[in-house]
Curated annotation (Swiss-Prot):
This is Sulfite reductase [NADPH] flavoprotein alpha-component. NADP(+) binds at S519, R520, K525, V526, Y527, V528, Q529, D561. Keywords: Amino-acid biosynthesis, Cysteine biosynthesis, Electron transport, FAD, Flavoprotein, FMN, NADP, Oxidoreductase, Transport. Pfam families: FAD_binding_1, Flavodoxin_1, NAD_binding_1. FAD binds at residues 322, 356, 386-389, 404-406, 410, 419-422, 599.
Amino acid sequence: MTTQVPPSALLPLNPEQLARLQAATTDLTPTQLAWVSGYFWGVLNQQPVALAVTPAPAAEMPGITIISASQTGNARRVAEALRDDLLAAKLNVKLVNAGDYKFKQIASEKLLIVVTSTQGEGEPPEEAVALHKFLFSKKAPKLENTAFAVFSLGDSSYEFFCQSGKDFDSKLAELGGERLLDRVDSDVEYQAAASEWRARVVDALKSRAPVAAPSQSVATGAVNEIHTSPYSKDAPLVASLSVNQKITGRNSEKDVRHIEIDLGDSGLRYQPGDALGVWYQNDPALVKELVELLWLTGDEPVTVEGKTLPLNEALQWHFELTVNTANIVENYATLTRSETLLPLVGDKAKLQHYAATTLIVDMVRFSPAQLDAEALINLLRPLTPRLYSIASSQAEVENEVHVTVGVVRYDVEGRARAGGASSFLADRVEEEGEVRVFIEHNDNFRLPANLETPVIMIGPGTGIAPFRAFMQQRAADEAPGKNWLFFGNPHFTEDFLYQVEWQRYVKEGVLTRIDLAWSRDQKEKVYVQDKLREQGAELWRWINDGAHIYVCGDANRMAKDVEQALLEVIAEFGGMDTEAADEFLSELRVERRYQRDVY
């Protein structure tokens, strides 16, 4: 059933209020809408609602604040599980996303728990950048009355493993905070470490925070996000791939695919800005090559999560083969006594470099050894899903979800190598074939609720994906706000992703401006950050008019270069020094007017 929106003249809300209401309720289920309706009825009639009970004074019961700083959702899931544990222990707890935390109140926190991941080259998650910057600034307060604990999630295949957690932990201590527990740094397989840490936190806090009354334990932040979808990272939807289209030219150095996935009647919902999680299977040819290099058959039985499987099946479905790590290299060297690899052990930088440049199968090829099947399995990490920025809006595509996939391809001594998930989608799933997917919601990359707000989108390469979703949504909403796109890639003729669609949006007036940077079409390389500087005066006018700025793409280089260009534009045309420009951009971030989806 479709609910018709009544004419605006009959509504007691102005257009801006209506837009905010629609944005806040667009992804709610009927059950959630019913609860919201009852909540507002209770407010109107001054009746108590289950989640609006007044907590006891802080003097009687010190509150526990959990700050969740998540990039891919894992840190948020750990924080939510801890909140539930503390509520079950009848403790007064509040869970807040780092992007929503009013960080100036940190001085009044008595019991503070931080759960954080790390992105890029050791940076905090996007939603925690402002808090991180505040704590490391001269404005950070003393925290002598604060006890804290930090749980850090990371990936040991990266050089700056768990750096964000290390930063928060050391800075909170430096500001005078008392450690409740030593920091825990967890790898990709974080679940066991998180479970143990949560139990220790609950035990530590029981002695610090008196037990809350039943009404208090319900009232103090038990609600953060309510997900009623039956599909999740651990229980994905089995959908079907309906379109796999190469959208770069035949002479392009890049292989970029437009992928469409049919969600059927699953009811799975997403918003522009969300990501699609994809569970993939390793290439059977890669599995066969690795097994044969180790003088195994692939039929050997191995144990995976309590189940006995043939080695080939375990490697294809359950273990990471396309990402090597320093730990794997070190363990393989020690296990096999490899003369080639043992000299690397103890040298973190060399181990990291070798792992970053050498696939597991090539490590085995270059340093051959014989391992039994269980030893191989124990060496590897569990397979994890890959996240892709969603390139569609359900306002246009309904029961579909689109993604833009840059396929990773390269050669090693004449042998073709490819990325695990990208080659799975591009090469190994037939049309109408099955794909296991889930939605990773990202409330830190959202279109403005006010449809009149101007939007500036900066997305070179596959970073264009969410802005296709943005434009579909803005067109469907008939949003009067202006839209400006900055896009870049090597060549105009080969790499202009979704060219016809952008031209149509310009013709229809949906896309107000488009600035393009082709880095290889002339002698001097030109990137999107150069276009930002070139259009600095107009860019500053848009910012002064309230524009929201969005950046999507590579975290390590592009995002940093774009941010530097924005700072230069703000300083030059806003008449500010470097420090003031940095403060101005930080304020835009806090106001959700500067949002990034970087990876």
